[in-house]
Design a protein with these regions (language model features):
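Sec-dependent signal peptide cleavage junction
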Residues: 20-31
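A glycine-centered loop/beta-turn motif at secondary-structure junctions
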Residues: 29-33, 76-88, 97-151
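Short, charged N-terminal beta->alpha structural module
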Residues: 31-66, 263-264
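Metal-dependent polysaccharide deacetylase catalytic core of the NodB/CE4 family, i.e.
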Residues: 33-38, 176-292, 320, 353
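A short, well-structured beta->alpha microelement
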Residues: 53-79, 300-308
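C-terminal domain-boundary segment and adjacent tail
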Residues: 144-147, 173-193, 273-285, 322-415
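Alpha-helical transmembrane segments
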Residues: 422-436
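Cytoplasmic C-terminal tails of single-pass
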Residues: 437-442
Length: 442
C-alpha cells in the first residue's frame, strides 16, 4: 500500500516539475518551414514572387530554410515541419523530385507550375486579393501559433521629428475618440538627442501612447546603404536608449525586406521579435543555394490603404499604413473608408515580444510593458514640464508596480494547491481501497 502511494506522489511531483519546462520548450521551438524554389520570378515578369512567399511564410512564426531546386536533400524534406514549393518555370522540377515531394503531401503546399495532376496554388502575384488568399492557405496549413485571429493593425507611418507634431496629436485624438488603437512607426534618432526638437518629438510620441498607440522603431535614415551591421546596431542602440530616457517605449522594429536576405543583418534582426516589413520594389535578384531566416513572434506585412479592394476577411497579420505627413482631411477620409469596409483594427498592445538594442531590454507581454524587468506605464501622458520637473518618475513607476497584484503568481499557487489536493485525494482513495479489501476478506 505504501509503495503505491509513494509512486503516485512521485508521479504528481514529477509532473509539477516537468510541466513548465515542457510548456517553455513548446513555446520556444518554432520549427522550420522549408521553401524550395527554382527561380525568384517568372520569366519576363518583374514581380519577385519568392519575396512574397517568404514574407508570407514568416507570418506563421516559423524559421525559414530557403533552398533552390538543386540543393535540397531527402533529409531536408524529412526534417522540415512544413514544405512550400515555388515553381516559377515549367519543368524545373524532375518527375522524381515531384514524386518525392508529394509523398509528403500532408505537409506540402505547391505554389506555381506543376506537371502533375495534384492540387497547386496558381501564380498570380499581381492581384493583391489573390496574394492574401494564398497567405491564408499558408497560414491554415502551417501556422500552429496559439493566436490565429485575423489581426490587422493601423499604422501612422514614417513619423519624423520635423513633421507637424500638432497634426500627429490631432490624429491621435481622432483615433482615440473613435476607439481605434494604432501603431506609430517613429523614425529612430541617434544624433542631437538633447535638442528641443527631440524633446518635442518624444513628447508627441508619449501623447500618442497615452491615446491608445504603441510605438515601433522606424528605420534610421542612412546616408550610406553599405553601413556595417555593427554600426547599424550601435545607432539603433543609441536610439532605443534615448527613447527610454524620454519615457518612450518601442516594442518592435520596421525593416526593409532587403534585410531578410543579407547575412550581415542577421544579428541586427535578432534584437527584435516584432517586425513590420516594408516592401522594396527594387529588391532585385534573390538567388541562394541555402539561406536561413529566423522566426519572429510577430510579423506584419505593410500595405497601403489604397490596396484594400477586397474583403476584410483576408486581412491577417497586416499593417495598414497611412503616412504621418498626410493632411488631416485625407487621414480622416481613409479611416472612414476602412470603417466602411468593416475593418476592425486589432489592439497592438497584444503584440507580445521584446526589443533588445542598447543597454535596456523592453518586453511587452500580458504582464504589461516592462524595461529590464520593471513595469513602466505608457498609458499616462507625461508632458515635458512634468518630465523635467519630476526628478524620480522611475521610482514612482516602481512604487506603482509594487501595488499591482501579480495574477501569474496567484495562478501558480492555485495550480500547486489544486495538484496537492489531487494528491491527497488519491492517497485517501487508495487507503479506502485498502480498508475495503480488509473488510471483504475477513
Amino acid at each position: 500500500m505504501f509503495n503505491n502511494i509513494k509512486k503516485v506522489v512521485v508521479l504528481f511531483i514529477s509532473i509539477i516539475i516537468i510541466l513548465p519546462s515542457i510548456m517553455a520548450l513548446g513555446t520556444e521551438n518554432k520549427g522550420n518551414l522549408l521553401i524550395i524554389y527554382d527561380e525568384y520570378k517568372e520569366y519576363g515578369e518583374d514581380i519577385n514572387n519568392l519575396n512574397y512567399v517568404i514574407k508570407i511564410a514568416l507570418t506563421t512564426g516559423k524559421n525559414i530554410e530557403l533552398k533552390n531546386v538543386d540543393s535540397y536533400t531527402i533529409e531536408d524534406l524529412n526534417k522540415a515541419q512544413g514544405i512550400i514549393v515555388l515553381s516559377n518555370e515549367e519543368g524545373a522540377f524532375k518527375q522524381s523530385q515531384v514524386d518525392d515531394l508529394y509523398k509528403r503531401s500532408e505537409k506540402l503546399l505547391w505554389i506555381g507550375k506543376n506537371s502533375s495532376n495534384e492540387d497547386v496554388v496558381p501564380l498570380n502575384f499581381k492581384d493583391k486579393k489573390h496574394l492574401f488568399e494564398m497567405k491564408n492557405k499558408i497560414n491554415d496549413k502551417f501556422n500552429n501559433k496559439n493566436n490565429r485571429e485575423k489581426n490587422s493593425y493601423l499604422v501612422i507611418d514614417e513619423v519624423y521629428p520635423y513633421d507637424d507634431l500638432n497634426l500627429l496629436v490631432k490624429k491621435a485624438d481622432y483615433l482615440y475618440d473613435n476607439g481605434i488603437p494604432f501603431i506609430v512607426s517613429a523614425m529612430s534618432v541617434y544624433e542631437n538627442l538633447e535638442f528641443d526638437a527631440m524633446k518635442r518629438y518624444t513628447e508627441a510620441l508619449r501623447y500618442c501612447a497615452s491615446r491608445g498607440g504603441i510605438i515601433i522603431l522606424g528605420e534610421p535614415y542612412l546616408y550610406d546603404n553599405g553601413i556595417s551591421e555593427d554600426e547599424l546596431i550601435q545607432r539603433l542602440s543609441i536610439a532605443q536608449d534615448a527613447f527610454i530616457n524620454y519615457k518612450v517605449y518601442p516594442i518592435g522594429l520596421t525593416i526593409n525586406d532587403e534585410y531578410l536576405y543579407r547575412n550581415d543583418r542577421f544579428n541586427y534582426l535578432s534584437n527584435t521579435s516584432t517586425i513590420i516589413i516594408n516592401e522594396n520594389e527594387n529588391l532585385g535578384v534573390i538567388d541562394f543555394e541555402n539561406h536561413y531566416i529566423p522566426g519572429f513572434n510577430n510579423v506584419l506585412i505593410k500595405i497601403q490603404g489604397e490596396d484594400l479592394n477586397f474583403s476584410e476577411d483576408l486581412l491577417t497579420d497586416v499593417a495598414i499604413g497611412i503616412k504621418g505627413n498626410e493632411s488631416f482631411d485625407t487621414f480622416k477620409e481613409k479611416i472612414d473608408l476602412y470603417k466602411k469596409i468593416g475593418i476592425d483594427f486589432s489592439n497592438p498592445r497584444n503584440l507580445e515580444g521584446e526589443l533588445t538594442f542598447g543597454d535596456n531590454k523592453i518586453n511587452n507581454s500580458r504582464k504589461g510593458l516592462m524595461v529590464n524587468g520593471v513595469k513602466v506605464s505608457g498609458n499616462k501622458f507625461i508632458s515635458n514640464e512634468e518630465l523635467y520637473g519630476e526628478k524620480d518618475l522611475d521610482q514612482e513607476e516602481q512604487e506603482t508596480e509594487k501595488n499591482v497584484v501579480d495574477l501569474t503568481k496567484a495562478n501558480r499557487w492555485i495550480f500547486i494547491i489544486t495538484i496537492t489536493g489531487v494528491i491527497v485525494f488519491v492517497i485517501f482513495l487508495l487507503y479506502s481501497f485498502r480498508i475495503d479489501r480488509k473488510k471483504y476478506f475477513k
